Amino acid sequence: MPFDKPIVHVIDDDEAVRQALAFQLGSAGIEVRTYESAVAFLQVAPTVHTGCIITDVRMPELSGIDLLRRLRELKHPVPVIVITAHGDIPLAVEAMRLGAVDFLEKPFEDEVLLASVRSALDQGDRDQKRQTERSNIEARLAALSNRERDVLKGLVAGLANKQIAYDLGISPRTIETYRANLMIKMQAASLSDLVRMALIAGVLDSNES
């Protein structure tokens, strides 16, 4: 069952730490799931699309650093906060290099934890919205004809209708028709909105002609 609500996924081999973090976050009204190992979390990782992850660095079987590497390979979208021992700066730096959004040194205050989690949840929410928008735009692009895509590329490149018509060997009036169809199919409110969506989807990066 997919996790669609913003949930904090706590990963730590120490049960006392898991319970303490769950209590701290739960007291702030944040929903929590706990896992005794990175391996246990990876089993459900494909169903986790929102929220954030809090993981200890030093764990048996699979460390927090190893988990970050796995998540990076999977292109997993959920932000990760890493918990490190006091003074364990090299591991913290490695974690950030692998994509962690923050690290917390033990011991840390409740306020520090909550601030970090809320920031990660906000980032995750923004990332999810961007991904959803991109997916929707790509679906609309897939419904365009090859000619409509050619016209769209011309518009995104800033070409005038007459120039696009000349390049494609058709009349400017036909370009106007294609342009009107593009606005409808792409659900664009304006030409600038159409161009914005095309840029998000990387239309100019396409090698199609």
Residue ranges, per PLM feature:
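Acidic catalytic/metal-coordinating carboxylates
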Residues: 36-37, 63-66
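C-terminal output helix
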Residues: 88-90, 104, 108-117, 163, ...
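Receiver (REC) domain active-site loop signature in two-component systems and cognate sites
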Residues: 59
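Acidic, metal-coordinating helix/loop segments flanking the phosphotransfer/catalytic sites
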Residues: 34-52
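Active-site residues of response regulator receiver
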Residues: 56, 84
